Regions:
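Rossmann-fold NAD(P) dinucleotide-binding segment
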Residues: 9-29, 40, 44, 187-192
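Rossmann-fold NAD(P)-binding glycine/threonine-rich loop
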Residues: 27-69
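NTP-dependent small-molecule kinase module
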Residues: 88, 92-104, 124, 128, ...
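Hydrophobic anchor at the beta1->P-loop junction of P-loop NTPases
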Residues: 110
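P-loop (Walker A) phosphate-binding loop of NTP-binding proteins
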Residues: 113
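Conserved lysine of the Walker
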Residues: 118
Length: 271
């Protein structure tokens, strides 16, 4: 299946030109769209276990071919050996540029329990990578004009989750961010697509005994409440996460591990 339509392209992300489940013998999906990196079509393909790819590599290869035509590079080739050498060098350059663009476009996203260190570690990663940092809880409070506990008390959890998802959809379709999510972002399945379309998701873990309690937050008011929360959310974190990083030392150590893991993930994706 090859999608050559603009359906699902930024900024109108999250829509698909068709449903892949209607094609039980489908062997592969190629979407020419590269913004976002994973359209709704590609996310469905991944869920169904169907091999798939976006159009970013083709974009770079097309640009390289155009450059050769514009500069008439092939006119200067005097023998087949030179032609092969030029083609091999071109392929290496295409892969390098593709890898650079992929890494620049991909968001590094932290999920995990409240108090696991997502904001602190995320900010350190953003500084190390030279990227903008977005803490979705901070953005929520700024836009709502009140704290999250106050919003919970005034409007309830359902209204909070609605607004949280809207913010996730807005930032998830952008690229090149380090993003720290609220602990409950995994409670709504729709948020997976919002975050995964351009993101590598890191589950930042920390023992419950080390997580802070906050009486003003009903969902994490006590150690018992946190244990119950972790029991419910653990499979959801596992479902969302691409990588798991333990934050059991200093924030700097966790950030260093996260940056290294993210870089490794990008190198693997660019091969």
């Amino acid at each position: 299946m090859i999608n050559t339509t603009p359906v699902g392209m930024y900024p109108d992300c999250g829509v698909s030109p068709l449903t892949l489940s209607a094609f039980p013998r489908l062997a592969g999906v190629f979407d020419l769209i590269y913004n976002p990196l994973r359209t709704a079509l590609l996310l469905e393909a991944e869920t169904l276990g169907i091999p798939c790819a976006n159009g970013l590599y083709m974009l770079v290869a097309q640009a390289a071919a155009s450059s050769r035509l514009f500069t008439r590079a092939s006119d200067r080739i005097s023998c087949r050996t030179e032609l092969v050498s030029m083609q091999e060098a071109g392929s290496r350059k295409i892969r390098a540029i593709f890898g650079k663009l992929l890494a620049e476009r991909t968001n590094l996203i932290f999920i995990g329990m409240p108090g696991a260190g997502k904001t602190t570690v995320g900010a350190l990663c953003a500084k190390a990578l030279g990227r903008p940092f977005a803490d979705l809880d901070v953005i929520f409070e700024k836009e709502a004009g009140m704290t999250i506990p106050d919003f919970f008390r005034t409007y309830g959890e359902s209204a909070f989750r609605d607004r949280e998802s809207e913010i996730a959809s807005r930032f998830g379709k952008e690229g090149g961010y380090v993003i720290a999510c609220g602990g409950g972002i995994v409670l709504r399945e729709e948020n997976y697509a919002y975050l995964k379309q351009n993101g590598v998701l890191i589950h930042l873990t920390r023992p419950v005994e080390l997580l802070p309690t906050d009486p003003s937050r009903p969902l994490s008011s006590s150690r018992e409440a946190l244990r119950e929360m972790e029991k419910i959310r653990a499979p959801r974190y596992a479902r969302f996460a691409d990588l798991v990083i333990a934050n059991e030392g200093t924030p700097s150590e966790a950030a260093e591990k996260a940056v290294s893991a993210f870089s490794g993930e990008m190198q693997g994706s660019a091969r």
